[in-house]
Amino acid sequence: MRHVAVIIPARYGATRFPGKPLADLAGKPLIAHVVERAQRARGVDVVAVATDDDRIVRAVRAAGGEAILTGPAATGTDRVAEAARKLAPRPEIVVNLQGDEPLIEPEAIEAVIGAMAGGARMATLARPLAEGELERTQVVKVVTRASGDALYFSRAPIPHRRAGGESPLARAHVGIYAFTAEFLETFTALAPGRLEGEEALEQLRALEHGYDIRVADTGYRGFGIDTPDDLERARALLAAGA
């Protein structure tokens, strides 16, 4: 079995919701919920939060989790890569799990880890599109080859369907990633691509440079906390047993 680390990048100064990782959610910091759910996933050897903020480090450790202090980073993936270098033993598979997903399902983490079987160097998840989501730019769409590797990710409705209506070929991307430790270093060393800049989608960097991304199915819809209103929704969902 390969050594697997789930690393959760977190920063304090989010523009829309400063201090978000430490926001109270059912009596504990939001980031603690992400850690606890990741710890429930089968096949995970270590879960760690990667942050450049001492307040987050203290909160995670007070909740019984592991936190790694990093330097300033351009992206969450850069922060994950730095944290992975500091782990001992060095993980063979690194899962990049967003720190604003307190309702993450352990099965989704297991699915992206499972997608790394068979020699994949990078993997992510996708789910069926709900009605009306194809046209929404907030929902990232992905289309894949017959092999299951990604052809393209876009905020636009892809593919265009000449017959009209919504295409059954596109799925909604769920932003959880797994990398081999070696490819994580390769990825973070790549120059940002033009398509990545146009779409504001970091994963396009791999495709632009000719690397494959395996895409596995999940039933998890994804629920990131971007605003205080999102936090209220999460509180209601947790109270209802989510």
From Swiss-Prot:
Chain ranges passing through the membrane: none
InterPro entries, per the entry: Cytidylyl_trans, KdsB, Nucleotide-diphossugar_trans
SUPFAM superfamilies the record matches: Nucleotide-diphospho-sugar transferases
Keywords: Cytoplasm, Lipopolysaccharide biosynthesis, Nucleotidyltransferase, Transferase
Entry-linked PANTHER family: 3-DEOXY-MANNO-OCTULOSONATE CYTIDYLYLTRANSFERASE (PTHR42866), 3-DEOXY-MANNO-OCTULOSONATE CYTIDYLYLTRANSFERASE, MITOCHONDRIAL (PTHR42866:SF2)
Annotated function: Activates KDO (a required 8-carbon sugar) for incorporation into bacterial lipopolysaccharide in Gram-negative bacteria.
Identification of the protein by name: 3-deoxy-manno-octulosonate cytidylyltransferase
Designated gene of the protein: kdsB
